[in-house]
Design a protein with these regions (language model features):
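Donor-sugar nucleotide-binding helix/loop cap in glycosyltransferases
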Residues: 1-148
Length: 148
């Protein structure tokens, strides 16, 4: 499966959608839309983020990673999803730079990384998607700092 560049901007909602789909294996796009108060288009953004992270399959069935998370670490769903993001080839590079250079500007670097791995999009798309990744990484960094 070719990975789709993420469009979901709220990482907490990605985790929530993943948990909902996992706990409701027969759910439909409309079920998720009703649960989250989303349009069907927004559901697709968040489901695609879950697919990108290998949390659900194309048909929304459970992946081996999802089963492992809920079987072995059910109290640590967020931590495991965050770990998956950090280990991602694209997002991990951006996360590492943000850790190493906390006061730096990260969006231009993120755009360059995203362009390298996902050629063929417009500059506006690169800027939006890279901004989402930077937001996700900031969220994870804040979470790590709070956990100590």
């Amino acid at each position: 499966m070719k990975k789709i560049l993420i469009q979901a901007n709220n990482l907490d909602t990605v985790v929530d959608v993943f948990m909902y789909i996992y706990m409701h294996p027969e759910c439909t796009h409309q079920d998720v839309a009703d649960y989250c108060g989303f349009t069907l288009r927004q559901v697709q953004y968040y489901a695609n983020a879950c697919k990108y992270l290998d949390l659900i399959n194309e048909d929304w069935s459970k992946t081996a990673l999802a089963i492992d998370i809920f079987t072995n670490h059910p109290a640590e769903v967020k931590d495991r999803v965050y770990a998956r993001i950090i280990s991602d080839e694209v997002m991990g590079q951006i996360f590492a730079r943000m850790i190493l250079l906390p006061d730096g500007s990260h969006n231009a670097y993120a755009v360059d990384v995203v362009k390298e791995y996902f050629p063929g999009y417009s500059d506006a798309v690169y800027e939006r998607r890279a901004d989402n990744i930077v937001k996700w990484c900031k969220k994870i960094i804040s979470y790590i700092k709070l956990k100590g």
